[in-house]
Amino acid sequence: MSRKLEALDRRKARVRRALRAAANGRPRLSVFRSSKQIYVQVIDDVAGKTLASASSIDKALKGELKTGADVAAATAVGKLVAERAKAAGVTKVIFDRSGYIYHGRVKAVAEAAREGGLEF
């Protein structure tokens, strides 16, 4: 494995360890970003189930996104996952940035989810 991927895995493990300690039973809002898309899930770690999810390739966002890899797409995905989480009865989450720095698309997802009504 390359050094960059190993470093990402170490950061991800470190972030998840801190989240597990601070979660207090709250579901986590997990972000995965690739070079072309962004994916967000609300996961209940106690039950091991995904409560809500959204991505830039979602059918609900099909016509309105120019690309799945920009801040505008991340904002739309954040709003969509907030709607779906509220419909599933989730209002408080803990944000899992998955080892990515809190900047750009990751920050846009978090801010849009907050605007959509999720608390973290």
Curated annotation (Swiss-Prot):
Keyword Thylakoid applies: no
Cellular component per GO, a single term: cytosolic large ribosomal subunit
Signal peptide: none
Family membership noted in the UniProt record: Belongs to the universal ribosomal protein uL18 family.
Keywords, alphabetical: Ribonucleoprotein, Ribosomal protein, RNA-binding, rRNA-binding
Biological process terms in GO annotation: translation
UniProt KW Zinc keyword: no
Pfam families with a match to the protein in the record: Ribosomal_L18p
Gene3D superfamilies: 3.30.420.100
Highest taxon, organism lineage: Bacteria
Summary of the function given for this chain in its UniProt record: This is one of the proteins that bind and probably mediate the attachment of the 5S RNA into the large ribosomal subunit, where it forms part of the central protuberance.
NCBIfam families noted in UniProt: L18_bact (TIGR00060)
Quaternary structure annotation from Swiss-Prot or TrEMBL: Part of the 50S ribosomal subunit; part of the 5S rRNA/L5/L18/L25 subcomplex. Contacts the 5S and 23S rRNAs.
Protein name according to UniProt: Large ribosomal subunit protein uL18
GO molecular function, one term: structural constituent of ribosome
